[in-house]
Amino acid sequence: LLGMLPVALSALSALSKL
C-alpha cells in the first residue's frame, strides 16, 4: 500500500493541473 501512495499523489497533482 505504501508504494501506491506516491502514485496516488502524482495522480492527484495531475488532476489538479486539469
Swiss-Prot record:
Q: Which organism is it from?
A: Pithecopus nordestinus
Summed up, the tissue specificity of this protein is: Expressed by the skin glands.
As for what it does, the entry says: Antimicrobial peptide with very low activity against Leishmania species (L.amazonensis and L.infantum). Shows low cytotoxicity against mammalian cells in models of peritoneal macrophages.
Record protein name field: Medusin-N1
Write down which residues bear the modification named Leucine amide.
Answer: L18
Q: Which family does it belong to?
A: Belongs to the frog skin active peptide (FSAP) family. Medusin subfamily.
Query: Which terms are listed as keywords in the entry?
Result: Amidation, Amphibian defense peptide, Antimicrobial, Immunity, Innate immunity, Secreted
Top-rank taxon of the source lineage equals Eukaryota
Name the GO cellular-component terms: extracellular region
Q: Where in the cell is it found?
A: Secreted
Q: Biological process GO annotation list?
A: innate immune response
